[in-house]
């Protein structure tokens, strides 16, 4: 089995221009994010800085995120929007791909049993 077959829903990412309580800055993509663990429906809000290198669907469209065992295996064969990178000082590795016209984030947590947020 590959990383996709072991995927588990993690959150939905929604683009916003409004500041939200508890935002954390992700330097690699220059975006402020909220913890979906603090939202009753696991929504993560993303607020991009004007100088963010992120463009296109990843910056403009919502995404659905899944936990996978192997992010490299999960992205194989997909149109990669943003290749794997670390967030939270090694808390997890993430990558973004297009799947049938929608943005999908694959997340490989350093600790697969992790329930928190970086």
Question: Can you annotate each of these PLM segments?
Answer:
Residues 60-62:
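Eukaryotic phosphotyrosine signaling hubs
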Residues 15, 65-69:
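Short hydrophobic/aromatic beta-strand micro-patches
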